[in-house]
């Protein structure tokens, strides 16, 4: 029909709060591997601890080819998380203000703990993670420099309330505007 008869306009934005990977995100600490992040958007950092996270984005390889990443949304996928202390070990942490319970620099994403089987190398867990990523996606650690990866809550949208009159989902308030 012609525009003169009217139109419906729908608009959305997708700048939902998230954890973006830094350019050199992969590191090992205490025999566990992590991605170092920085947060985007107005987040309550304490809400990001121990929830399942999915990874989304794209990695540009050195040869210019790209790899789309979507890990954690399918039921068979692994998920990731920001670690937090158990309550009985967190006495000092619990003295912090709400905005500092989890500090920005503590929002590192746990990505693995299994070491590479070679006694002659250091950072065995980091090496094992890179071996997995290279085998599955054909990427090297240098490829992270040109990657745009983000971690988001790995929860499905659900009805809220006995009457199912509301929805609860990551970013729905941003994506519907």
What are the residue ranges of the model-derived segments?
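N-terminal hydrophobic/helix-forming segments and targeting peptides
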Residues: 1-177
């Amino acid at each position: 029909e012609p525009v003169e008869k009217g139109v419906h306009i729908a608009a959305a934005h997708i700048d939902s709060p998230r954890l973006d990977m830094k350019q050199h995100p992969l590191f090992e600490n205490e025999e566990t591997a992590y991605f170092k992040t920085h947060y985007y958007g107005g987040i309550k950092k304490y809400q990001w601890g121990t929830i399942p996270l999915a990874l989304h984005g794209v990695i540009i390889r050195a040869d210019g080819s790209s790899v789309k990443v979507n890990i954690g949304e399918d039921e068979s996928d692994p998920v990731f998380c920001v670690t937090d202390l158990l309550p009985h070990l967190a006495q000092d942490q619990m003295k912090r203000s709400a905005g500092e319970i989890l500090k920005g620099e503590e929002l590192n994403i746990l990505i693995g703990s299994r070491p590479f089987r070679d006694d002659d190398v250091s950072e065995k867990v980091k090496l094992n993670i890179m071996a997995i990523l290279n085998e599955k996606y054909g990427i090297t650690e240098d490829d992270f420099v040109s990657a745009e990866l983000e971690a988001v809550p790995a929860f499905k949208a659900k009805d809220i309330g006995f009457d199912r009159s509301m929805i609860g989902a990551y970013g729905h308030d941003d994506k519907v505007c």
